[in-house]
From Swiss-Prot:
Name of the protein in question: RNA-free ribonuclease P
Keywords, sorted A to Z: Endonuclease, Hydrolase, Nuclease, tRNA processing
Molecular function GO terms recorded: ribonuclease P activity
Pfam short name (any one): PIN_5
UniProt similarity note: Belongs to the HARP family.
GO biological process, one term: tRNA 5'-leader removal
Amino acid sequence: MLKQRFVLDTTALTDLQTREVMGYTSLCEGMKAILDLIADARLQFGISCYVPYPSVYKEMYEFASRNGCDREVTAKIDTWLVKKAPDRYRVDVTSQIFHEYVSYMRERINRGMGVAEDAIWEAATECLFMENPQNKKKEYREEVEREVIGGIIGKFRNKYRAALRYGILDSAPDIDVLILAKELDAAVVASDYGIEKWAEQLGVRFVPANTFPMMIKEYLKHSPEGEKEKGEADKKKKSHSEEAEFI
């Protein structure tokens, strides 16, 4: 059997939808459960799960610490994820990919600029239509900032992120995940549309974070231990069925 390799993005361990599918509400418990599955897959099938070092490893470690996870979680990260720095100088990526990426980024930046301009115009228009008693200039300014500018800036930030960040590689760890996967001929595991989109461009296999645990469980079901447990469960089921028929 060809040994599987996976390169994990931080979202492979932290994705909310994945936790919900697995039945966990706690981030730390969800991370533990996924890492335990990775441990079983490593021991029973030799499946290797890599993490780019230091970028994604540091991101995972800090995420776990910041969310109050105990040292057991970080110990599992250190034990069961293979830390490897991507070879950025030897992995070949065609110039066409970079050409498309630059064009794509330019388009997104222009769209983000358009959102910013709309927000500025909206704020200016709102200000013009408000009463402005000269003797209450300070109170007026505070009112504008509180009731007009604050809300518009909040909407602007959300729209700007959606226009500019969705579907792009916006961090060094994202790029490291793809480079390492390309280097190892491994599949990428993530919950990030930008990584998914550019994995396709690079010819790298992509596994959504929310299906990854189910995939590992499917492997484990067909291990010697899994087959044994399945056989015992079938025997119990058959025994209960025979008892019911006898009654």
